[in-house]
Amino acid sequence: MENKWILNSGNSPKHPEFRLFCFPYSGGSASYYSGWNQLFGDNIEILPIQYPGHETRADEPLIPDVRALAEAALEGIVPDTDMPFGFFGHSLGALVAFETAALFTEYELDLPQMVFLSSAGTNFDRVQPPVHTLSGEALKKT
């Protein structure tokens, strides 16, 4: 049975030793990672995550909540965690990857060996207000 959460790029290694689930950025899609299998050799299989409302799943409604998206993705990911695995997420994908990894802990599932997060901000307080809220004069002074 085909997994709608995983984009099959058709160039996966035959006998991988590790699986890397890749979560795309907001507005992105799983096909962004379709060429990555060629970059990582025969030991690592890249499994791009396809969100509802994107590309091959464009007819499905978007899931606007990160936690709900992680919960839904978890169901699609778990069947392919039968070997060592990790997560990579970029931007919004970093948030979804982090939340999904947290769910593995919450549900006492085998944990990813690695979680790579790129270009995602933290929840720290800003020192100054965001520039889009500044008046023209205040913006000139920054």
Kindly give the residue locations of the regions a language model identified:
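Domain-scale detector for complete catalytic domains at protein termini or as standalone homologs
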Residues: 1-88, 92-142
